[in-house]
């Protein structure tokens, strides 16, 4: 019983095996070329490979009567070149006209470049939209009357591509942006082409036989003259198509044609170098095998099979077979074959596909060849290469537009290099400047500490050194030991803030507080902050100096007011500065900067203007200038506190005798 139940359960779990893999013999729907040649003619111009993979156009070549060429009398209307339909839209509708360009970055679509233009077609208002992505270019014309409200740029982009998912687009402000954009749009348009020309004689069914032919029949020579003009390769100035025009290593002559301002160079198999003993004739195959489209000329009725030539590039063939005509010239039968992933391309072949020699047929044939190459670009192998190339070019365009737009607004440029550690030495150069400034400030500190009892009156009410040597030491101009600017970056990627690395040079000095001598009524040093004339001039403009007449009175009044405050402040001095770097200003001043008042009349004496400034450099988006404080910071005596650095600004003038004032 158990075995029976288990058996039924196993039957339920059984599944049918997949069919066995088919061998190549199971996929042979077409006869081989040798089988076809064993039959009676006439034979078709093209035979499909045994395993398929190609399509054929133009299989009817029965000549019941001489074909008329009326359908080809107007090649400008019936025969036209097929290229990327969006490649010339920008040049036609946007370039030189009022329009707007934007750029953005989408997480899925990648880099986006968007162009829009207000257009009036007839009596109706329209929006012409052109969106470039890494895969393709979207174009549409939207009537404004169909919109409930006028859309913003993001909504406009979604009108042409619903997959757009960005918060905003950024305007392009570069005056030469149109040149960059039109160059990108038209990179898919080529004015130079190279096609292979293979001569197939009767009974030739392999690659080796095709490339080993050296003789040219009169019909083939006539066809080459019809196809283009014979040119000497030595010192040839036109498009050479990879042929050697200097040393003659790829033959002495070839066939060249200029068709509708497009240069075409033909790689003719019989004119390329022939190598004795080389069955594959690599000198010939390396040119024709690297072409994308080739013409196969048949003298007589021998079918051509597309897989005769092993090549990863050849995707389409135009087979032409000469047919004896009459006094009006020869007739040509034409068939076209291409790989399955190559889309159909025009102009379509007539039925029957037979042409009489003439300018109309030349127009048709050259147009067919050019359109064949454009169509081959859409094949899977070339489409991947094209997508990678397009993505790289679009990224380059995006970066160019962004950099130039930022530069037009005074942003980016050298600032981006400095914050990324490149340009101007980066971090290491800044660090060396900081260390250099630190040593200078410490030297000044040592000199000031050596002579603590020699003081004189300063403009702010403190006492300045009367010794000339000390005055020189104190005359070191605005020592900037380190710099920590905070910049507000306004760009498409949000507020990227980057602060250059600076080191606060704070020297801790411990000194015993001693009472001043009996004759000295004030401490060693006193500091007070003075209200500047404007907010932004606290560290830039020189303070107003009193005249010599009332100098003593002013100093006496301020010294009395600072008496209590000076006792609580530290006698040690530290040199530090906070310098704010505004947007768009290149270069960093980390050296010594002096503010001299020697040019002011009646100011002959040397003064030291000492002030306490509160470090108000904001790391927020504002980044306002450091502002002065009316009263000293509560923790001013703590020299090791980096949040409240002491800023000592020294103004030096000509070194002359300084009057001593007593309180």
Swiss-Prot record:
Induction: By 12-O-tetradecanoylphorbol-13-acetate (TPA) in promyelocytic HL-60 cells. Gene3D superfamilies: 6.10.140.210, Rap/Ran-GAP. This is Rap1 GTPase-activating protein 1. Disulfide bonds: none annotated. SMART domains: GoLoco (SM00390). Changing residue 388 to A/P: Reduces GTPase activation. Residues 1-17 form the GoLoco domain. InterPro entries: GoLoco_motif (IPR003109), Rap/Ran-GAP_sf (IPR035974), Rap/Ran_GAP_dom (IPR000331), Rap1_Ran_GAP (IPR050989). PROSITE patterns: GOLOCO (PS50877), RAPGAP (PS50085). Changing residue 257 to R: In a breast cancer sample; somatic mutation. It comes from Homo sapiens (Human). It is a peripheral membrane protein. Residues 567-579, 616-630 have a biased composition (Low complexity). Keywords: Golgi apparatus, GTPase activation, Membrane, Phosphoprotein. The modification Phosphoserine is found at residues 441, 484, 499, 515, 541-542. GO terms for biological process: adaptive immune response; cell-cell adhesion; cellular response to glial cell derived neurotrophic factor; establishment of localization in cell; negative regulation of microvillus assembly; negative regulation of neuron differentiation; negative regulation of thyroid gland epithelial cell proliferation; phagocytosis. Residues 181-397 form the Rap-GAP domain.
